[in-house]
């Protein structure tokens, strides 16, 4: 079965987006799938605004362990976060910056609580570059201007979802993994969503939603 038929129990594309936005406003997580011919993987996504230590612990336990903070290009510039590498030749051009740690309020930086502290410090509207140390255990990602309409990636999807939900334009993501360490695909992602009461949606759903409502996002 393909991605679309497996997702049918979560409703039609527009409904899937609306359910995801409602969940984010309520402080719950969502699962975002990219295109089948791209990574074909699903990321757990939480808003920074409502992020809890328990949610971070679940991400660390159930996912790849590489917890990323998705930021607008403007906010990443404000924090003076240069690219992780000068020549980004990765397949999907994921815009990693140098890693970060909060300068205050953390110990080793690797615990769930410490990562939440770092994330909330960095995403704060009044945050300054001097609030952060490098390297660290949180990996910021720059979302491309135009969101999923310009790049069909989880980074852009995350920031778009936060803006569409009326939340701070910053979110965290991590790729869902199976118990054996392999990456979860659509059937496992759907099962996880049902178990943990997380709506599942796709990048394509978001593109359709933005086109239908002619949404112009930063």
From Swiss-Prot:
Detail which positions bind D-ribulose 5-phosphate: 38-39, 43, 151-155, 175
Q: Which GO terms describe its molecular function?
A: 3,4-dihydroxy-2-butanone-4-phosphate synthase activity; magnesium ion binding; manganese ion binding
Q: Which reaction does it catalyse?
A: D-ribulose 5-phosphate = (2S)-2-hydroxy-3-oxobutyl phosphate + formate + H(+)
The record's function comment reads: Catalyzes the conversion of D-ribulose 5-phosphate to formate and 3,4-dihydroxy-2-butanone 4-phosphate.
UniProt: Mg(2+) 1 binding residues: 39
Pathway, according to UniProt?
Cofactor biosynthesis; riboflavin biosynthesis; 2-hydroxy-3-oxobutyl phosphate from D-ribulose 5-phosphate: step 1/1
The record ties this protein, via InterPro entries, to:
DHBP_synth_RibB-like_a/b_dom, DHBP_synthase_RibB
Q: Do the record's keywords include Metal-binding?
A: yes
Q: What is its EC number?
A: 4.1.99.12
Q: What is this protein called?
A: 3,4-dihydroxy-2-butanone 4-phosphate synthase
| Signal peptide span | none
- The lineage's top-level taxon is Bacteria
Q: What is the free-text note on the cofactor?
A: Binds 2 divalent metal cations per subunit. Magnesium or manganese.
Tell me the Gene Ontology biological-process terms attached to this UniProt entry.
riboflavin biosynthetic process
Give the protein's cofactors.
Answer: Mg(2+); Mn(2+)
- For this UniProt record, give its keywords in alphabetical order, as a comma-separated list: Lyase, Magnesium, Manganese, Metal-binding, Riboflavin biosynthesis
């Amino acid at each position: 079965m393909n991605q679309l038929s497996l997702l049918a129990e979560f409703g039609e594309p527009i409904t899937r987006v609306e359910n995801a936005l409602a969940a984010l406003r309520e402080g719950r997580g969502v699962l975002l799938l990219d295109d089948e011919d791209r990574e074909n993987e699903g990321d757990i996504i939480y808003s920074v605004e409502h992020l809890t230590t328990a949610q971070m612990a679940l991400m660390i336990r159930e996912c790849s362990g590489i917890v990323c903070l998705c930021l607008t290009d403007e906010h990443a510039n404000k924090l003076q976060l240069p690219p992780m590498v000068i020549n980004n030749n990765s397949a999907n051009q994921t815009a990693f910056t140098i890693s970060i740690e909060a300068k205050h309020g953390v110990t080793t930086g690797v615990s769930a609580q410490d990562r939440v502290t770092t994330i909330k410090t960095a995403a704060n509207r009044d945050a300054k570059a001097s609030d952060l140390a490098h390297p660290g255990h949180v990996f910021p990602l720059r979302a491309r201007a135009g969101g999923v309409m310009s790049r069909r990636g989880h980074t852009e999807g995350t920031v778009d979802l936060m803006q569409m939900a009326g939340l701070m334009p910053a979110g965290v993501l991590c790729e869902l993994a199976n118990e054996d360490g392999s990456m979860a695909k659509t059937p496992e992602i759907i099962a996880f969503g049902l178990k943990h009461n997380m709506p599942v949606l796709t990048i394509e759903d978001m593109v359709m939603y933005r086109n239908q409502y002619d949404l112009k996002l930063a």
